[in-house]
Amino acid sequence: MARFFAFTDADPAMPSLPRPGVSHIAAAAVAAAAYTCVHGAIAWKLFQVHGNDYIVHVKWAEDLYRTGRIAVPHFLYHLLIDAMYAAHLASSFLLGGRLVVIGAYALAAVLIYGVLWVVFQGDRRLGRAPVLLAATGAVLVAQPIARLGWYTIGYLWNDPYNTPTFTLLRPFAVAGFFLTVRFLYGRRRADWGVLLVFVLAVAGGALAKPSYLICLLPAAAIVAVLRILRRAPLSPGALLMGLGLPALAILAGQYLLAYSGRFGAVGYRDGIAWAPLRVMGHYASGLVAKFLLSTAFPLAVPILHWKTARRDGMMQLAWLTFFFGACYVYLLSETVQWAAANFVWSAYSSLFVLFAATMVFWLRQVAAVPVRSWLWLRELVCFGALAAHVIAGVLMDKTCLEWVARH
């Protein structure tokens, strides 16, 4: 993992990294196990609720297996279910769907921990397993700062619990983002192993759910053009082969299948319209407050560390990607099934990655603060915002687990 995600502030070139120790391997395993035990348990129960997204996608997977008919252009979840069923790793399509979701939760936790370890493994304070485990848990658990009984549109969520394709997307989004950072902010030649992982992360994310890639691709393109104009170092070959070509090919195909009106190869057909606040305004009021409560930590950190944050390439890309995600959800809608609010997944996925990037950036700033300094007050404000997100997430998980216990 280290060779895939290694990067530094100024130049994301791969440093020489040791193998992770037993404590870090154990901590990553604990993060994955704890996350799957909580969120996996919630998802496991949701597979028994008739008519929700979990059941619908399992039915589409079975239809794909038996008839070859593709229901939606993002069909990776269905393919994985069918592969598990065909290989006799799951006795039913339902069990296959559950296992894929559990695996995606575990992989997301391991990837977040792995990124943090790559960055901080040389720091005696922040590179310890308990610290990285706590940081990983905070990123995974964080939710909008509100006391809610269940998922509701209006806030922006790191994990809305209710859609398996979004759960599958998140590890691909994390991998795709940090690999893009690695090649966008340094000039180097990618070996075939790293490039293959990059392609798989991008293609897998698009086929799981294209919501994140339609944000990352334009953001990365803008940053790349600006760096070319400024003659700043980047890796154009790796970016083109790992991100640009597979992303454009898959996204173009998905658009033609679902939105062009020219092909009937998939069951899902619709259009895209310019419709500011049509969706979010329909479901919620007080959108400005809900936005701020959903993004308090990612907002507080760059505001309080503005001089450093505005020059940090990772933060630039993360925020620009989230900007596109927010624009999609607040300004666009589908023309027919607009009430499905499918553009929310762009905002949710880009916010999740923004939380991860902000955690990396913030911990770097914490590591640089002298032990006795008034600057710790600034870090306490950031910690307070993060703690509020985490507490809200824990309370939300508690509510969901209580629902699971009652049913």
Show which residues each predicted segment covers:
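Start-transfer (signal-anchor) and selected internal transmembrane alpha helices
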Residues: 1-39, 125-133
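Perimembrane helix-loop-helix junctions
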Residues: 15, 216-245, 273-275
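Transmembrane signal-anchor helices characteristic of membrane glycosylation enzymes that use polyprenol
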Residues: 20-52, 108-110, 135-144, 203, ...
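Short hydrophobic/aromatic helix or loop-helix immediately within or flanking a transmembrane segment
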Residues: 56-64, 68-98
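Transmembrane-helix motifs of polytopic, lipid-linked glycan transferases
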Residues: 99-125, 175
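Membrane-interface micro-motifs in multi-pass membrane enzymes
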Residues: 129-181, 341-350
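Membrane-interface alpha helices of multi-pass inner-membrane proteins
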Residues: 193-210, 216
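Transmembrane helical bundles and short interhelical boundary loops of multi-pass, membrane-embedded
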Residues: 247-252, 256-407
